[in-house]
């Protein structure tokens, strides 16, 4: 078995970025509460994320699955995963327009199989953060957001070649993640529904194959939020 890097490594620059964002959020909310125009949301999402879809012009360099199909036959599953997502949003309203910051943590895991019996398991943890802009309508709050972040991923391969089998575990972190999203919140007093479509570029090099796999793609998510 070949191993690369620790499981879900935490880099110093990641800690600094998240800490700096949290400091900004704390200062931002502290100042705005004095004029009663600061809002915070805690959201829980689920839905579908298509790893094979082009992330809306952000760029994707995925050739890992195609390379495996050349040697191990057709992929038996599609490349859609079902992420679990938790989001935190802090923003300040000025009339019907609002802007602020957001932090999102998502995780997914899926096994893929090929026609010759080979297979792999892909697991990823994403931490995304950026800016959000809202229009506060009477019945819904459409929004647009963009930002950056990182993904940590683990891939476990079991690949057959004739009578031999190769098992490999690869760990990797992608620090060049970028995203943007469109969506809407439908409020019902302090809680409500949220729908969003997100486009994410996060290309990871698989060291065992010298190929790239997309960890982002296009997500269509639905969830609930609580405002406070």
Which residues does each predicted region cover?
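Short glycine/proline- and aromatic-enriched beta-strand/turn motifs that initiate or cap beta-hairpins
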Residues: 32-106, 110, 225
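Cleavable N-terminal export/targeting peptides
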Residues: 1-39
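Predominantly the C-terminal beta-signal and adjacent terminal strand-loop region
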Residues: 55-59, 65, 74, 170, ...
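Gram-negative (and chloroplast) outer-membrane scaffold detector with strong preference
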Residues: 82-163, 176, 215, 221, ...
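Extracellular loop and loop/strand-boundary signature of outer-membrane beta-barrel proteins
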Residues: 70-77, 113-122, 162-171, 205-213
